Amino acid sequence: MTPEKINFIQPVESGKPDDFLILSSSWEERCLGVAQRLKSYSCKKILINVYDNSTTKKEEIYKELKNLLKQKGEVQAVNSKQSNPLDGIKRMLYHIKSNFQNVNPKISLDISCFTRKHLLQLLNCLDCNNLLGNTNFYYSQPTEYYTENNSSNAEGIKSICIAETFSGENLSSRDTALIIFLNFEGRRALALWQELQPNVALPIIPFPSVKAGWNEKVQNQNKLLLSTLNLSWEDLEKSSPLNPDDTKELLLRLTSLKPGQNNILKHSNYNFMIAPLGTKPQVLGIFKYCRLFPDKISIAYPSPIKYKDLPESFPTESTWLIDKSINWER
Protein backbone atom coordinates (compact mmCIF):
# COMPACT_ATOMS: atom_id res chain seq x y z
CA MET A 1 0.00 0.00 0.00
CA THR A 2 1.01 3.63 -0.39
CA PRO A 3 1.98 5.14 2.99
CA GLU A 4 -0.55 7.69 4.23
CA LYS A 5 0.31 10.65 6.44
CA ILE A 6 -2.26 10.80 9.21
CA ASN A 7 -3.43 13.24 11.86
CA PHE A 8 -5.37 10.71 13.94
CA ILE A 9 -5.06 6.96 14.50
CA GLN A 10 -8.12 4.96 13.51
CA PRO A 11 -8.89 1.44 14.80
CA VAL A 12 -8.34 -1.53 12.52
CA GLU A 13 -12.10 -2.03 12.24
CA SER A 14 -14.03 1.21 12.04
CA GLY A 15 -16.25 1.88 15.04
CA LYS A 16 -14.81 -0.92 17.18
CA PRO A 17 -11.95 -0.77 19.67
CA ASP A 18 -8.73 -2.55 18.79
CA ASP A 19 -7.70 -5.53 20.85
CA PHE A 20 -4.14 -4.24 21.27
CA LEU A 21 -2.01 -1.17 20.72
CA ILE A 22 1.68 -2.11 20.77
CA LEU A 23 4.49 0.44 20.88
CA SER A 24 7.89 1.05 22.43
CA SER A 25 9.04 3.73 24.82
CA SER A 26 12.39 5.39 24.07
CA TRP A 27 14.69 8.30 24.75
CA GLU A 28 13.38 9.61 21.40
CA GLU A 29 10.43 11.97 21.65
CA ARG A 30 8.96 10.47 18.50
CA CYS A 31 7.80 7.49 20.56
CA LEU A 32 4.99 9.89 21.54
CA GLY A 33 3.90 10.39 17.92
CA VAL A 34 1.16 7.76 17.81
CA ALA A 35 0.05 8.45 21.39
CA GLN A 36 -0.45 12.13 20.48
CA ARG A 37 -2.81 11.13 17.66
CA LEU A 38 -5.37 9.01 19.52
CA LYS A 39 -8.20 11.54 19.74
CA SER A 40 -11.09 9.11 19.15
CA TYR A 41 -9.13 5.86 19.40
CA SER A 42 -9.64 3.15 22.01
CA CYS A 43 -8.41 -0.38 22.57
CA LYS A 44 -8.71 -3.13 25.15
CA LYS A 45 -5.02 -3.43 26.03
CA ILE A 46 -1.97 -1.23 25.46
CA LEU A 47 1.41 -2.96 25.57
CA ILE A 48 4.41 -0.64 25.98
CA ASN A 49 7.86 -2.11 25.44
CA VAL A 50 10.30 -0.63 27.98
CA TYR A 51 14.02 -1.18 27.47
CA ASP A 52 16.60 -1.52 30.23
CA ASN A 53 19.38 1.05 30.77
CA SER A 54 17.02 3.63 32.20
CA THR A 55 17.97 7.32 32.09
CA THR A 56 16.29 10.46 33.37
CA LYS A 57 15.22 11.39 29.86
CA LYS A 58 13.75 7.95 29.19
CA GLU A 59 11.82 8.09 32.47
CA GLU A 60 10.41 11.53 31.66
CA ILE A 61 9.28 10.48 28.19
CA TYR A 62 7.83 7.20 29.49
CA LYS A 63 5.81 9.11 32.10
CA GLU A 64 4.44 11.41 29.39
CA LEU A 65 3.67 8.40 27.18
CA LYS A 66 1.66 6.70 29.94
CA ASN A 67 -0.27 9.91 30.61
CA LEU A 68 -1.24 10.13 26.94
CA LEU A 69 -2.35 6.50 26.85
CA LYS A 70 -4.11 5.98 30.18
CA GLN A 71 -7.52 7.08 28.91
CA LYS A 72 -7.30 4.92 25.77
CA GLY A 73 -7.05 1.43 27.26
CA GLU A 74 -5.50 -0.68 30.01
CA VAL A 75 -1.75 0.01 29.97
CA GLN A 76 0.77 -2.79 30.55
CA ALA A 77 4.55 -2.24 30.55
CA VAL A 78 6.62 -5.08 29.06
CA ASN A 79 10.28 -4.98 30.06
CA SER A 80 12.98 -6.17 27.68
CA LYS A 81 16.72 -6.00 27.19
CA GLN A 82 17.85 -3.82 24.33
CA SER A 83 20.77 -6.16 23.59
CA ASN A 84 18.69 -9.35 23.67
CA PRO A 85 14.93 -8.78 23.39
CA LEU A 86 13.77 -12.41 23.15
CA ASP A 87 12.62 -12.65 26.78
CA GLY A 88 10.68 -9.41 26.36
CA ILE A 89 9.07 -10.81 23.21
CA LYS A 90 8.00 -13.91 25.15
CA ARG A 91 6.42 -11.66 27.78
CA MET A 92 4.66 -9.68 25.06
CA LEU A 93 3.33 -12.91 23.58
CA TYR A 94 2.12 -14.04 27.01
CA HIS A 95 0.13 -10.82 27.53
CA ILE A 96 -1.46 -11.10 24.09
CA LYS A 97 -2.45 -14.75 24.49
CA SER A 98 -3.68 -14.17 28.04
CA ASN A 99 -6.07 -11.49 26.82
CA PHE A 100 -7.08 -12.93 23.44
CA GLN A 101 -7.86 -16.58 22.78
CA ASN A 102 -8.38 -16.57 19.00
CA VAL A 103 -6.09 -15.89 16.05
CA ASN A 104 -5.46 -12.52 14.43
CA PRO A 105 -6.56 -9.95 17.01
CA LYS A 106 -7.02 -6.37 15.86
CA ILE A 107 -3.64 -4.74 16.50
CA SER A 108 -2.26 -1.26 15.87
CA LEU A 109 1.54 -1.53 15.97
CA ASP A 110 3.84 1.50 16.16
CA ILE A 111 7.23 0.32 14.87
CA SER A 112 9.05 3.63 15.37
CA CYS A 113 11.16 3.00 18.46
CA PHE A 114 11.81 -0.74 18.60
CA THR A 115 15.37 -1.67 17.70
CA ARG A 116 15.59 -3.22 14.25
CA LYS A 117 16.52 -6.63 15.61
CA HIS A 118 13.70 -6.50 18.16
CA LEU A 119 11.20 -5.46 15.52
CA LEU A 120 12.12 -8.34 13.21
CA GLN A 121 11.95 -10.90 16.00
CA LEU A 122 8.67 -9.52 17.37
CA LEU A 123 7.07 -9.63 13.93
CA ASN A 124 8.30 -13.17 13.40
CA CYS A 125 6.94 -14.29 16.77
CA LEU A 126 3.51 -12.77 16.17
CA ASP A 127 3.35 -14.17 12.64
CA CYS A 128 4.33 -17.69 13.73
CA ASN A 129 1.57 -17.59 16.37
CA ASN A 130 -1.11 -16.43 13.90
CA LEU A 131 -1.39 -13.07 15.63
CA LEU A 132 -0.33 -10.72 12.84
CA GLY A 133 -3.06 -11.15 10.25
CA ASN A 134 -5.14 -8.10 11.21
CA THR A 135 -2.56 -5.44 12.04
CA ASN A 136 -2.13 -1.81 11.02
CA PHE A 137 1.46 -0.53 11.09
CA TYR A 138 2.43 3.03 12.00
CA TYR A 139 5.69 4.92 11.81
CA SER A 140 6.59 8.34 13.23
CA GLN A 141 9.27 10.32 11.44
CA PRO A 142 11.33 12.70 13.62
CA THR A 143 12.11 16.28 12.70
CA GLU A 144 15.80 15.34 12.60
CA TYR A 145 18.29 12.59 13.43
CA TYR A 146 21.38 12.86 15.60
CA THR A 147 24.39 12.69 13.26
CA GLU A 148 26.92 14.94 14.97
CA ASN A 149 30.47 14.34 13.65
CA ASN A 150 28.98 11.75 11.27
CA SER A 151 28.13 9.63 14.31
CA SER A 152 24.83 8.22 15.55
CA ASN A 153 23.34 7.43 18.94
CA ALA A 154 24.62 3.83 18.66
CA GLU A 155 28.14 3.73 20.10
CA GLY A 156 30.72 1.16 19.04
CA ILE A 157 30.23 -2.46 17.97
CA LYS A 158 29.80 -5.06 20.70
CA SER A 159 29.25 -8.05 18.44
CA ILE A 160 28.15 -9.07 14.98
CA CYS A 161 25.86 -12.05 14.81
CA ILE A 162 23.09 -13.72 12.88
CA ALA A 163 19.81 -12.67 14.49
CA GLU A 164 18.11 -15.52 16.32
CA THR A 165 15.10 -16.88 14.37
CA PHE A 166 16.61 -15.49 11.14
CA SER A 167 19.36 -18.00 10.37
CA GLY A 168 19.06 -19.13 6.75
CA GLU A 169 20.96 -21.41 4.42
CA ASN A 170 24.74 -21.26 4.67
CA LEU A 171 26.27 -23.79 2.28
CA SER A 172 30.04 -24.04 1.93
CA SER A 173 29.66 -24.51 -1.82
CA ARG A 174 28.22 -21.01 -2.24
CA ASP A 175 29.65 -17.52 -2.06
CA THR A 176 28.12 -14.99 0.33
CA ALA A 177 26.07 -12.04 -0.90
CA LEU A 178 25.45 -9.27 1.64
CA ILE A 179 22.54 -6.94 0.95
CA ILE A 180 23.13 -4.02 3.30
CA PHE A 181 20.59 -1.29 3.94
CA LEU A 182 22.30 2.00 4.70
CA ASN A 183 21.10 5.11 6.49
CA PHE A 184 22.64 7.18 9.29
CA GLU A 185 24.84 4.50 10.86
CA GLY A 186 27.83 4.29 8.55
CA ARG A 187 30.30 3.06 11.18
CA ARG A 188 28.13 0.07 12.06
CA ALA A 189 27.68 -0.72 8.38
CA LEU A 190 31.42 -0.53 7.71
CA ALA A 191 32.25 -2.71 10.73
CA LEU A 192 29.72 -5.29 9.59
CA TRP A 193 31.17 -5.45 6.09
CA GLN A 194 34.74 -5.69 7.42
CA GLU A 195 33.79 -8.56 9.73
CA LEU A 196 31.81 -10.58 7.20
CA GLN A 197 33.98 -9.92 4.12
CA PRO A 198 31.24 -11.05 1.72
CA ASN A 199 32.04 -12.06 -1.85
CA VAL A 200 29.41 -9.62 -3.07
CA ALA A 201 28.06 -6.53 -1.29
CA LEU A 202 24.95 -4.72 -2.49
CA PRO A 203 24.30 -1.47 -0.57
CA ILE A 204 20.78 -0.04 -0.61
CA ILE A 205 19.97 3.54 0.31
CA PRO A 206 16.67 5.17 1.32
CA PHE A 207 15.52 7.21 -1.67
CA PRO A 208 13.89 9.56 -2.34
CA SER A 209 14.74 11.25 0.93
CA VAL A 210 11.85 12.22 3.19
CA LYS A 211 13.48 15.59 3.93
CA ALA A 212 15.80 17.92 2.07
CA GLY A 213 19.40 17.39 3.11
CA TRP A 214 19.03 13.83 4.36
CA ASN A 215 20.49 12.35 1.16
CA GLU A 216 23.70 14.27 1.84
CA LYS A 217 23.77 13.02 5.43
CA VAL A 218 23.46 9.41 4.27
CA GLN A 219 26.27 9.97 1.76
CA ASN A 220 28.55 11.46 4.43
CA GLN A 221 27.76 8.69 6.91
CA ASN A 222 28.66 5.96 4.41
CA LYS A 223 31.41 7.62 2.40
CA LEU A 224 34.20 5.31 3.61
CA LEU A 225 32.25 2.11 2.96
CA LEU A 226 31.20 3.21 -0.52
CA SER A 227 34.72 4.28 -1.46
CA THR A 228 36.05 0.94 -0.19
CA LEU A 229 33.52 -0.85 -2.39
CA ASN A 230 34.40 1.51 -5.26
CA LEU A 231 30.77 2.53 -5.64
CA SER A 232 29.34 5.94 -6.40
CA TRP A 233 26.00 7.25 -5.13
CA GLU A 234 24.55 6.76 -8.61
CA ASP A 235 25.53 3.07 -8.60
CA LEU A 236 23.48 2.21 -5.52
CA GLU A 237 20.20 0.36 -5.37
CA LYS A 238 17.43 2.48 -3.84
CA SER A 239 14.21 1.80 -1.96
CA SER A 240 11.61 4.04 -0.38
CA PRO A 241 12.30 5.00 3.25
CA LEU A 242 8.55 4.79 4.00
CA ASN A 243 7.03 2.07 1.81
CA PRO A 244 7.71 -1.51 3.01
CA ASP A 245 6.41 -2.98 -0.25
CA ASP A 246 9.06 -1.08 -2.21
CA THR A 247 11.75 -2.79 -0.13
CA LYS A 248 10.14 -6.21 -0.49
CA GLU A 249 9.86 -5.85 -4.27
CA LEU A 250 13.47 -4.67 -4.55
CA LEU A 251 14.69 -7.74 -2.64
CA LEU A 252 12.64 -9.97 -4.91
CA ARG A 253 14.24 -8.31 -7.92
CA LEU A 254 17.77 -8.62 -6.54
CA THR A 255 17.45 -12.31 -5.72
CA SER A 256 16.11 -15.31 -7.58
CA LEU A 257 13.83 -16.66 -4.88
CA LYS A 258 10.70 -15.72 -6.82
CA PRO A 259 10.31 -17.23 -10.31
CA GLY A 260 9.91 -14.89 -13.24
CA GLN A 261 11.96 -12.02 -11.80
CA ASN A 262 14.83 -10.40 -13.69
CA ASN A 263 17.30 -11.23 -10.96
CA ILE A 264 20.75 -9.80 -10.30
CA LEU A 265 21.93 -12.62 -8.02
CA LYS A 266 21.10 -16.29 -8.47
CA HIS A 267 20.11 -18.02 -5.26
CA SER A 268 21.81 -21.22 -6.37
CA ASN A 269 25.15 -19.36 -6.31
CA TYR A 270 24.89 -17.44 -3.03
CA ASN A 271 24.12 -17.61 0.64
CA PHE A 272 22.04 -14.47 1.16
CA MET A 273 22.53 -12.22 4.17
CA ILE A 274 20.64 -9.00 4.81
CA ALA A 275 21.89 -6.25 7.12
CA PRO A 276 18.88 -4.14 8.25
CA LEU A 277 20.51 -0.78 9.01
CA GLY A 278 18.01 1.32 7.07
CA THR A 279 14.70 2.83 8.15
CA LYS A 280 12.11 0.97 10.23
CA PRO A 281 9.64 0.80 7.29
CA GLN A 282 12.45 -0.83 5.29
CA VAL A 283 12.88 -3.32 8.15
CA LEU A 284 9.18 -4.15 7.87
CA GLY A 285 9.71 -4.67 4.13
CA ILE A 286 12.65 -6.99 4.87
CA PHE A 287 10.41 -9.04 7.14
CA LYS A 288 7.68 -9.24 4.50
CA TYR A 289 10.30 -10.58 2.09
CA CYS A 290 11.84 -13.07 4.55
CA ARG A 291 8.49 -14.54 5.58
CA LEU A 292 7.91 -15.63 1.98
CA PHE A 293 11.08 -17.73 2.07
CA PRO A 294 11.57 -19.14 5.58
CA ASP A 295 15.00 -20.62 6.29
CA LYS A 296 16.51 -19.12 3.13
CA ILE A 297 17.73 -15.72 4.37
CA SER A 298 20.04 -14.80 7.25
CA ILE A 299 19.81 -11.45 9.04
CA ALA A 300 23.25 -10.10 10.01
CA TYR A 301 23.05 -7.65 12.90
CA PRO A 302 25.83 -5.52 14.45
CA SER A 303 24.93 -4.88 18.10
CA PRO A 304 26.31 -1.61 19.51
CA ILE A 305 28.18 -1.45 22.81
CA LYS A 306 25.59 1.00 24.05
CA TYR A 307 23.20 3.71 22.98
CA LYS A 308 24.34 7.19 23.93
CA ASP A 309 22.36 9.26 26.39
CA LEU A 310 22.11 12.23 24.06
CA PRO A 311 21.59 15.82 25.22
CA GLU A 312 18.76 16.30 22.75
CA SER A 313 16.12 14.31 20.92
CA PHE A 314 13.74 15.31 18.20
CA PRO A 315 9.94 15.32 18.26
CA THR A 316 7.66 13.76 15.68
CA GLU A 317 7.25 15.64 12.44
CA SER A 318 4.81 13.23 10.77
CA THR A 319 3.12 9.94 11.56
CA TRP A 320 2.34 7.52 8.76
CA LEU A 321 0.08 4.54 8.29
CA ILE A 322 2.56 2.45 6.30
CA ASP A 323 0.97 -0.98 5.94
CA LYS A 324 -1.95 -3.28 6.69
CA SER A 325 -1.24 -6.97 7.15
CA ILE A 326 -4.68 -7.93 5.88
CA ASN A 327 -3.27 -7.25 2.40
CA TRP A 328 -0.20 -9.49 2.82
CA GLU A 329 0.56 -12.59 0.81
CA ARG A 330 -0.25 -15.77 2.72
Language model segments and positions:
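Long, low-complexity, Lys/Arg-enriched
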Residues: M1-K106, F114-R330
